[in-house]
Each structure stands twice: as C-alpha cells, then as structure tokens.
C-alpha cells in the first residue's frame, strides 16, 4: 500500500555529505600524522572545549542550566545532574528518555506513540511541554537526542525565573558538539539484532590560523522496529562554524533531521481484569500504516563579547521547527468477551511547530562594600507557534480485529477530514526581563536570588472556521532564592525556594480567562564534588495549584482552576570514579506524587509515577590487554509499580521491573589509527516492561524493548 510521505528522505543530500566528509578524512589524517601544526596563540574560552571543565569521564562538575552561566555544581542551590559524553558512548542510547535513565526522578512520559520526546520530571511533564532545551534555547523538535549531542544537563524543580513558562518539574538542556581548534575525525557504524543499523561521520578542525573552526556531523540510521512490523529511519546533517577571537566568540550551527518512525501506542489493558492483555509482546494492535514521517530543523547563532575583565555580553538567536504527518488505526474499546478491539482511523496532516528565540544577557562581576557579586541580567523573546492542519477522524469502522488472532490490512487509511477538529492552534508570544544576583559572603556563603517578569500573549483554538477558545494576555513575576554553604572546599549544603507558572489554556473548548497554573517548591540538599566523584542528595516538596478541572452545574460543564497536585520526595545521585579503574553512575528516587484537590482525581497518584526508582551502572577499566585497552560494564535499572490513569478516576497498576544492561569495549591501534570495537546488550535477561501511559482516556500502555544486541565500530583519525 502506498502511503503519503510528507518528508521523503533527501538521500542525495545525505549521501553527498557523507561522501564529502569521507573525502576530507584522507588529508586530515595525513596532515595529522606527517607534520605538526602550529597555530598562533589564541585566547580560547571554555566555549571551544566545553566538556573540559564541565565533565570528567562519568563525573559532572559544572553546568549552565542552573544559572544560565557555566557554574560549578557545588555552588548551585538546586539539584542539577550532568549526563556526560563518556557515559552516553558506553550506553549507546537511541532516545532521550533512555539517555536519562540513570538520573533520579526522571521517567518516560506520554511519547504520543513513540513519536515525541516526553519526560516526567519529579512527576510533572508530557510531550511538547517546552521543557527541552538545546544549548539553552527552547526546542520544539520531536527527537532531541541526536548524533550532535555532547552531554545533557538536568535542572530539577521550578525554573520559570530562568526559562519562563514551565511546569514545576524542571528542564533538560542538551549541549551540542561544537567546532574545535584541534583537528579530529571519526567514522563509526553499528548494527542491531533487530535488523539494520547506522553510520556516522564527525569532522572538526581549524580553518586557517586565526581562530576559525568548523564541524560537520552526518548520520543515517535504518533499522527494524522490534515489534512484528515497522521500520525506523533517521537522517541527520549538521554543519557548524565558530570563531574564537579572544574577546569575541561567534558560533553558527544548523541541524536538519528527517525521520520516519512507527506510531505505536503499545498494548491495551483489559478493564475487566485491570491487567495488560495476555498476548505476545511483539504483537501490534494497529496497522502497518501507523507511521509518523517528518522533518525538523534547528538553527542557532551565538555571539559572546568580553567588554572588560569583569563584564561580558551575550546575544543569541535560535530557530527550531518540526513538521510531520501521521496515520494510525487507533484502539477505541476492547470487548473482553469476544477479544475484539474496536479501532478508528485517525490522522494528522501538515502539522507544524516553529519557535523563534531571541536572548540578550549581560554578565558582570563587581564588589560592593567588600562583598562579591556576580550579576546576570537580560531580555528574552519567544514566539512559539503550533498548528495541526488536517485532522482526520473516521468513524470506528473496524470491530472485527481479534487481539488473539489478528488479521492486518483490512482497515483502510483514514480519509475523513474533521472540520471541527482541524487547525488546532497554540500561538504564544512572550517577552521577559530578568535579573539574577549571586552574592559571595566570605569564603563559605553563597546566596543566589533572582526575579523575572514575563509578559505573554497566548491564543488557542481550532476548527474551520477557526474558533478561539482561549486568549490570555497577561504578565507574571516569578522569584527564585537559594543559599549554599560550603562545609568544606568540596562539600556543600543548600536550600532553595523557586516558583513556576504556565497559562491555563484549552484548544478543545472555550474556558475564558483563568489564572495560570503555579508551582512552588522548597528544596534542601547536600553535594560532594571531589576530584573524580560527584554526589548529590536532595529533599523536595512541590505544590502545583490552579490546575484545570471540570465541574457540572445543572447539567452544564464548566472549567475551573480548583485542582492541585503535590510531589515530594528524596533523590540520590552518584557519578564519577570510585577508583582509578572503576567508574559508576547510580541513582535512587523516592517520589510521592498525587492529586490533592479535584472533583474526580483527588487522592490518586500522578500518571506514570513510580514511588521507587533506582539505577546503577558500573564500568571496569582493565587497562592494557594485548595491544589495546579493555573496558567492560554492567548495571541495573529498576522501578516499583506505577499507575496508569484513564482520566475518569480509574487507575490501573503496572508491575515493577528490574532490567540489566552490559557492554564490553576494546580500543586498539590499527594502521596508525585508533579503533574501538564495542558490544552492548540491552535488557540482558529479556524482561517484559511497561514504560508509560500512551493515551489519557484510553488504557493503552507503551512497552519497553526486549533484549537487544548492538555491535559498534569506530575509527578515530
């Protein structure tokens, strides 16, 4: 069956870039091995090699996500985690939630059938919640963990003082690979036991001898989906250029992605038993045309200028976009007596989201009355526009699909455009000013305080003709205050108070003007940042108020903001080296998250939240073995049972799980180049796992991948 394909992969473009990159390897290699390159002395800031200060192997040392300036983790009065490049290379994740599986308090959210990034942070969050950033700028891309990822920073708790409109769970900031003034080149390829694999080229180095550098990353992935049908396709082309001019640094980066992924909402819950259907986990309940195809683009322009030894200016522009079409045979209801599933043909065509971000900040260091201050002040502008064009909603026209004896191919593609549901629109404009002051009181006390004022205009609605269901034009001030005390040069304790907000809007129904959702959090914790090991312990309490609820008065539904939710718990994180040969990333979280007020959901746990989660991944470096170096690692990921709600007061319990992973890697020289061979086993004991609720109102449950073998080879020139 021929399917409409809105973003046919530009194979010529990708293959041309791969060929060009490979041609560039020979001279780069020859120059590196046959002659030394002498560059003029250039005052290169940390922007050129950002990982040197921020990470050390598995250890995170500093991050920019917590203050919008690179700050030692020890001084930050909130819980901040860093997922390092070394850890990502050992674990070889393919999605953002998998990359963050070693961080406490983070779980997969509703990924819209595996087509969107979605993270629960301390119990809050969903897909397209604007909590994912790339190099400090908001991203609307569906798939943010790409081959350009250098490391990932996670700030937990309310963060509206720094990032504006947000849920109170936190934000994730992906730091991308930057052009380097040192010539490097690598080619890698991998294969999976699911069938298929991928290849990547990464080139970087100087252009001339005056501080100009480039980077080019090209990647293609083609492999089979692990269930009984489906294929995953992804192509990335990412050139960037930077000038490190001493007092002035300028960087321009572009990334283009085209993708085609299964739209798979997973399995179903039998509501008569409250348990997942007793069918093989590989069996899909939709059709082969359940596919999302799309493309995304990201463009960033950054300029930093040092005005003096104490003051610097930064200006950023970011553009992020995502365009997609999807088709699905959507499960609507299940008859437990007959085993038949009623399905409806749904589709979204010409869905697009764009975000334009402008930011200007002034950073200064000064002393007043003998007290040191680090000031950050700035202006942010955001224009985020999302519209879902044609919404197709066929009548439930297939009630003959038997989940125990399925026959595929009998349900036609959706074809009925719903005028009432089409052109679903969410348009947000926001302008903000902010001021943050970090005060150093002597050698031990650090006080960080700030305030932000956001002026925003948001319009939502749908339909042909278009109907505006929400128009909010308002402003909101949000504060932040934190205190850090250095018990020792490497050990600190901290406490913080922070707030968040999000306008109350509705695309589906008119709700009038309602006050925004608000999040308020208190947090206390302690941190140890040693030479090779970082440890964090945090206790937190988050209240979320003004949550939308529906009430019925004389048979009429009204929307009110009487709902409240609460999240509180304990988080422990450890990363770095235990010894010179043993590295670890470990975490544990206890999370009590539930709805505390509301006519239907009061007292129920927040969707998708496990009360207990834990992970540990330990790596041993065996040193020299024969002509190379041998490393091996293994670990566990575990969570307690969690609840999937139907939105109407019913919560279904999903079982706990413990999953093991392992890898072995061998580095050795070959023909004068460094070659790495790596073998990973994911889900070593082939456990069946359930990862998230994939549709509110429908008991559909996303499933974790079975055991997978991944073989990878990399050559560094």
Summary of predicted features, one role per range:
Residues 148-150, 161-239, 243-249, 297, ...:
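Outer-membrane beta-barrel translocator/receptor signature
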Residues 258-272, 383-387, 480-528, 534-560, ...:
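Surface-exposed extracellular loop regions of Gram-negative outer-membrane beta-barrel proteins
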Residues 221-225, 238-306, 319-353, 396-426, ...:
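Acidic/polar loop-and-plug regions of large Gram-negative outer-membrane beta-barrel proteins
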Residues 40-182, 524:
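Acidic, small-polar-rich N-terminal luminal/periplasmic segments of exported/outer-membrane proteins
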Residues 304-318, 322-328, 493, 516-577, ...:
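Membrane-embedded beta-barrel scaffold of Gram-negative outer-membrane proteins
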Residues 541, 561-646, 714:
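Gram-negative outer-membrane beta-barrel transporters
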Residues 31, 351, 375, 522, ...:
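Conserved C-terminal beta-signal and adjacent last beta-strands/turns
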Residues 238, 242-244, 353, 372-376, ...:
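Structural signature of Gram-negative outer-membrane beta-barrels, strongest in the C-terminal barrel
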């Amino acid at each position: 069956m021929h399917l409409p394909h809105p973003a046919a992969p530009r194979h010529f473009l990708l293959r041309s870039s791969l060929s060009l990159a490979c041609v560039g390897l020979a001279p780069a290699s020859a120059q590196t091995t046959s002659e030394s390159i002498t560059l003029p002395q250039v005052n290169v800031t940390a922007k050129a090699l950002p990982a040197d200060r921020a990470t050390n192997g598995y250890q995170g040392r500093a991050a920019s996500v917590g203050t919008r300036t690179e700050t030692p983790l020890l001084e930050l009065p909130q819980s901040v985690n860093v997922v390092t490049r070394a850890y990502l290379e050992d674990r070889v994740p393919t999605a953002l939630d998998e990359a963050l599986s070693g961080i406490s308090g983070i779980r997969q959210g509703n990924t819209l059938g595996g087509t969107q990034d979605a993270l629960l942070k301390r119990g809050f969050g969903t897909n397209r919640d604007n909590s994912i950033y790339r190099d400090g700028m908001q991203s609307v891309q569906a798939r943010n963990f790409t081959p350009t990822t250098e490391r990932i920073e996670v700030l937990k708790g309310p963060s509206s003082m720094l990032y504006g409109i947000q849920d109170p769970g936190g934000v994730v900031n992906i730091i991308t690979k930057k052009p380097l003034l040192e010539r490097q080149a690598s080619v890698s390829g991998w294969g999976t036991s699911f069938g298929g694999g991928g290849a990547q080229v990464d080139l970087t180095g100087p252009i001339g001898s005056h501080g100009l550098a480039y980077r080019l990353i090209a990647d293609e992935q083609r492999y089979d989906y692990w269930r009984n049908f489906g294929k995953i396709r992804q192509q990335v082309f990412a050139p960037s250029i930077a000038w490190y001019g001493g007092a002035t640094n300028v960087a321009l980066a572009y990334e283009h992605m085209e993708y085609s992924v299964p739209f798979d909402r997973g399995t179903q819950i039998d509501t008569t038993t409250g348990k997942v259907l007793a069918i093989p986990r590989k069996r899909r309940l939709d059709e082969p045309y359940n596919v999302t195809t799309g493309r995304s683009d990201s463009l960033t322009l950054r300029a930093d200028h040092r005005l003096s030894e104490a003051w610097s200016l930064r200006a950023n522009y970011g553009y992020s976009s995502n365009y997609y079409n999807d088709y699905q045979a959507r499960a609507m209801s299940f008859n437990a007596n007959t085993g038949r599933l009623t399905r409806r043909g749904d589709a979204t065509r010409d869905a697009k989201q764009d975000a334009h971000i402008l930011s200007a900040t002034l950073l200064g260091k000064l002393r007043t009355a003998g007290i040191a201050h680090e000031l950050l002040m700035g202006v942010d502008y955001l224009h985020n526009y999302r519209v879902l064009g044609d919404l197709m909603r066929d009548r439930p026209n297939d009630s003959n699909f038997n989940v125990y004896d399925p026959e595929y191919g009998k349900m036609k593609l959706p074809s009925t455009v719903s005028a009432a549901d089409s052109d679903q629109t969410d348009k947000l404009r926001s302008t903000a000013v902010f001021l943050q002051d970090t005060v150093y009181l002597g050698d031990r006390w650090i006080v960080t305080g700030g305030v932000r004022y956001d002026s925003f205009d948001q319009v939502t609605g749908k339909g042909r003709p278009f109907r505006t269901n929400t128009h909010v034009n308002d402003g909101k001030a949000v504060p932040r205050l934190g205190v850090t005390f250095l018990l020792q040069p490497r050990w600190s304790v901290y406490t913080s108070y922070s707030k968040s907000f999000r306008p109350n809007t509705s695309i589906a129904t008119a709700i009038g003007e309602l006050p925004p959702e608000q999040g308020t959090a208190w947090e206390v914790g302690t941190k140890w940042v040693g030479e090779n090991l970082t440890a964090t312990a945090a206790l937190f309490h988050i209240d979320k108020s003004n949550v939308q609820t529906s009430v019925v008065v004389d048979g009429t539904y009204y929307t009110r903001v009487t709902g409240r939710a609460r999240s509180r718990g304990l988080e422990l994180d450890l990363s770095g080296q235990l010894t010179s040969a043993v590295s670890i990333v470990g975490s544990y979280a206890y999370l009590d998250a539930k709805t505390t007020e509301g006519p239907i959901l009061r007292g129920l746990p927040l969707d998708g939240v496990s009360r207990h989660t834990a992970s540990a991944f330990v790596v041993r470096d065996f040193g020299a073995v024969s002509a190379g170096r041998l490393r091996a690692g293994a670990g566990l990921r575990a969570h307690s049972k969690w609840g999937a709600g139907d939105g109407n007061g019913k919560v279904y319990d999903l079982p706990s799980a413990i999953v093991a992973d392992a890898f072995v890697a061998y580095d050795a020289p070959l023909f004068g180049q460094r070659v790495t061979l790596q073998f990973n086993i994911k889900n070593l004991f082939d456990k069946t796992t359930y990862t998230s609720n994939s549709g509110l109102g429908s008991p559909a449950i996303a499933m974790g991948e079975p055991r997978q073998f991944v073989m990878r080879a990399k050559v560094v020139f």
